[in-house]
C-alpha cells in the first residue's frame, strides 16, 4: 500500500479517536470548551505527523529521552548576561511590591464578574476584532482568573518589557539604569488602570513585551537563512498577536521605533536617511503585520463575527482632518491635565524631564542637523500618543483622555525623554538625573499605593451596599429564591470617589475612579456572584420600560436608594433604582 495513504489513514484514525474520546468525556459530564477540543485535535495530528516521519521522530526521541532538561534549562538561564537577569529580578520584585495590596486582595472590575466566576473564552473578543485578546489567559490558566498568580505573570511581562526597552534603545548597560528605566515605565497609575479589567490584565500588560520582542527579532541577523526566516516570522506573529489583542498598541509601536531612531541620531553623525535604512527589515515586518491584521479583521467582518467596535473602526479621512486641531490641543494638554492619582505636581516632574531632554539634545547632540531632526521626531512621538483618538471612531468609550489607552503611549514617551538624558549625560549630569528619576519613581509608588487604598475602600463599600439591597429584596413578599428574574438596574453607585480627595479642574477617569463595581446593565453576574442561587437570569434591555406596570412604577412611584420605593418586583422583573439623575433621564425619555 502507498506510504502516503497509510500516513493519511493513521492521522484520520487518530483524529477520529480524539473526537470520540471528547464525546465520551462530554457524555460523562466532563465538558470541554471548543478551543480545548481544537487544540487537542491539532496536537494529535501534529504528533502523528511527527511520529511517522523518521527524521523528526529521531530528533523528538533525542529531545525527550536523551537531554537532561534541568541542565539544559540551567545552561540557557546562565547564558543570559548577568545584567539582564539581575535587572529583571530586581524590577519584577519592585513591581510586585508596588502592586502588592491589589495582588493580596484579589480585586476586579465591574466587567469581570462572569470571567472571575467561570473563565474567559478565546471567542470573547472576536466581536470587537480582538481575536487574540484571551489566548495567553487560555494558554496559562485555561481561561481562569486566579488570585496572586495572575498578577505575578502580569508583572513578569511588565518587568520583561522594561528590560527589553532598555536593551532596544541601547541604553548604558548598568543594572541601575535598566531597573530605573523599567520602573519609570511600569509603575504608574496608567498601569493600575488595566488592573480594573481583570480579564484583560494579563493579555494587555504583556503587549509591550511582545512588541519589543518583535522589534528586536526583526533586527536580529543570522548567516543561517532558515534562522533569519524564523526570526522574521516570529516577529510578525508577535506583532499580529499584539494588534489582535488591543489596537491602541500602535502608539507604543510608533514611539518605540521613533525612540530607537532618535537614539541612533543623537549618538552618531549618520543622517536621518542613513539611520532609517537600518530599520528596513523592522519596517517591512511591521507592514506585513498590519496587512495580515487587516486581512483577519476583514474576514471577521465579512463573516459577521465582528461588530464595528470603537477600537477597530476607523474614522473617515474628512473626520480625521476635522479632529486634527482638537488632537493637537489634547496632545499638549495631556502633559499638564490632572487626573485621579495623576496630580499636577506629579506631572510637573515629568515636564522637567521633557525640558531637560530637549536641552540635552540641543547642546549635546553630535550635529545641529541631527539635533533638529531628533526634536522633530520627539514632536512626532508626542503626536503618536494620540493616534487612537485621531483615527478611531469617537464615542463615549473613547474620549480624549483614557488612562488604559494612554498606558501604551504617555509612560513610554516620558521614559524616552529620561532615556535621552541618560544616554547623553556626562557622569555628573547622569548622577543627578538618576536621582531625579528615582524621586519620580518613588512618587509613582506613593500614588499607586494611594489608589489601591481608595479602590479597596470603594470595593468594600459597594459590596456592603449590594448586601443591603439583597437583604431588602428578600423581605419583599413577591421574592422567590427559586425563581429566575430579569434585572432592571437604574444607575449605579461608584463609591471609590467617597475615599478620594479630588483636586480642582481634575479630569475624571472611569477605570481609575468613576466606574462602579456593580454596573448598570451588567448586574446579572455581579448580583448572582455571592448569592446561593442564580436568581437573575439576564440583564433586561430598555424594552422593559415599555411594560405598562414598569412604566407606571418608574414615572410615578420610583425613588432612588435608600428610599423604600427604590426596589420593586413586577412580574419577572427586579427593579433597583440607585441614581436619582439616571432615574430623571429615563422619566424624561418615557414622557416624550
Residue ranges and their predicted role:
Residues 31-35, 46, 69, 73-127, ...:
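Intrinsically disordered, polar/acidic, low-complexity terminal segments
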Residues 252-287:
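Perimembrane helix-loop-helix junctions
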Residues 230-247, 252-258:
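Membrane-interface alpha helices of multi-pass inner-membrane proteins
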Residues 229-232, 423-448:
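Signature aromatic-anchored transmembrane alpha helix within multi-pass, membrane-resident enzymes
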Amino acid at each position: 500500500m502507498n506510504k502516503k495513504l497509510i500516513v493519511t489513514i493513521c492521522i484520520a484514525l487518530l483524529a477520529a479517536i480524539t473526537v470520540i474520546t471528547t464525546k465520551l468525556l462530554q457524555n460523562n459530564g466532563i465538558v470541554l470548551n471548543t478551543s480545548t477540543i481544537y487544540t487537542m485535535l491539532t496536537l494529535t495530528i501534529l504528533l502523528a505527523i511527527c511520529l511517522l516521519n523518521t527524521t523528526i521522530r529521531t530528533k523528538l526521541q533525542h529531545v525527550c529521552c536523551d537531554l537532561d532538561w534541568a541542565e539544559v534549562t540551567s545552561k540557557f538561564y546562565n547564558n543570559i548576561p548577568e545584567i539582564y537577569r539581575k535587572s529583571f529580578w530586581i524590577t519584577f520584585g519592585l513591581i510586585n511590591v508596588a502592586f502588592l495590596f491589589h495582588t493580596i486582595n484579589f480585586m476586579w472590575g465591574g466587567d469581570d464578574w462572569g470571567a472571575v466566576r467561570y473563565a474567559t473564552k478565546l471567542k470573547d473578543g472576536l466581536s470587537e476584532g480582538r481575536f487574540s485578546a484571551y489566548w495567553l489567559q487560555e494558554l496559562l490558566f485555561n481561561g481562569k482568573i486566579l488570585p496572586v498568580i495572575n498578577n505575578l505573570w502580569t508583572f513578569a511581562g511588565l518587568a520583561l518589557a522594561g528590560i527589553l526597552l532598555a536593551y532596544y534603545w541601547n541604553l548604558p548597560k548598568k543594572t541601575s539604569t535598566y531597573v530605573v528605566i523599567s520602573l519609570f515605565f511600569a509603575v504608574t497609575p496608567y498601569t493600575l488602570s488595566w488592573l480594573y479589567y481583570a480579564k484583560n490584565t494579563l493579555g494587555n500588560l504583556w503587549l509591550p513585551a511582545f512588541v519589543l520582542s518583535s522589534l528586536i527579532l526583526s533586527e536580529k541577523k543570522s548567516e543561517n537563512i532558515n534562522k533569519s526566516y524564523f526570526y522574521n516570522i516570529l516577529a510578525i506573529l508577535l506583532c499580529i498577536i499584539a494588534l489582535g489583542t488591543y489596537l491602541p498598541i500602535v502608539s507604543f509601536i510608533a514611539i518605540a521605533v521613533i525612540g530607537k531612531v532618535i537614539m541612533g541620531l543623537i549618538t552618531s553623525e549618520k543622517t536621518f536617511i542613513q539611520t532609517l535604512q537600518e530599520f528596513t527589515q523592522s519596517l517591512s515586518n511591521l507592514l506585513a503585520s498590519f496587512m495580515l491584521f487587516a486581512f483577519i479583521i476583514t474576514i471577521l467582518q465579512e463573516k459577521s463575527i465582528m461588530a464595528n467596535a470603537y477600537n477597530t473602526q476607523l474614522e473617515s479621512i474628512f473626520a480625521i482632518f476635522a479632529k486634527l486641531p482638537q488632537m493637537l490641543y489634547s496632545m499638549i494638554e495631556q502633559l499638564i491635565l490632572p487626573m485621579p492619582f495623576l496630580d499636577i505636581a506629579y506631572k510637573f516632574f515629568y515636564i522637567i524631564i521633557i525640558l531637560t531632554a530637549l536641552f540635552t539634545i540641543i547642546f549635546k547632540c553630535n550635529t545641529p542637523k541631527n539635533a533638529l531632526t531628533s526634536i522633530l521626531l520627539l514632536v512626532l512621538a508626542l503626536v503618536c500618543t494620540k493616534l487612537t483618538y485621531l483615527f478611531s471612531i469617537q464615542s463615549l468609550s473613547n474620549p480624549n483622555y483614557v488612562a488604559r489607552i494612554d498606558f501604551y503611549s504617555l509612560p513610554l514617551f516620558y521614559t524616552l525623554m529620561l532615556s535621552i538624558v541618560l544616554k547623553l549625560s556626562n557622569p555628573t549630569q547622569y548622577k543627578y538625573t538618576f536621582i531625579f528619576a528615582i524621586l519620580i519613581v518613588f512618587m509613582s509608588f506613593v500614588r499607586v499605593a494611594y489608589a489601591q487604598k481608595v479602590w479597596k475602600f470603594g470595593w468594600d463599600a459597594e459590596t456592603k451596599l449590594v448586601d443591603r439591597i439583597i437583604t431588602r429584596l428578600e423581605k419583599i413578599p413577591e421574592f422567590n429564591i427559586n425563581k429566575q428574574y430579569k434585572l432592571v438596574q437604574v444607575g449605579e453607585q461608584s463609591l471609590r470617589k467617597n475615599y478620594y480627595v479630588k483636586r480642582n479642574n481634575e479630569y475624571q477617569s472611569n477605570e481609575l475612579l468613576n466606574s462602579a463595581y456593580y454596573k448598570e446593565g451588567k448586574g446579572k453576574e455581579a448580583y448572582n456572584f455571592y448569592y446561593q442561587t442564580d436568581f437573575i437570569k439576564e440583564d433586561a434591555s430598555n424594552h422593559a420600560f415599555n411594560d405598562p406596570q414598569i412604566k407606571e412604577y418608574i414615572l410615578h412611584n420610583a425613588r432612588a436608594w435608600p428610599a423604600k420605593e427604590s426596589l420593586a418586583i413586577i412580574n419577572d422583573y427586579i427593579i433597583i433604582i440607585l441614581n436619582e439623575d439616571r432615574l430623571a433621564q429615563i422619566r424624561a425619555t418615557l414622557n416624550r
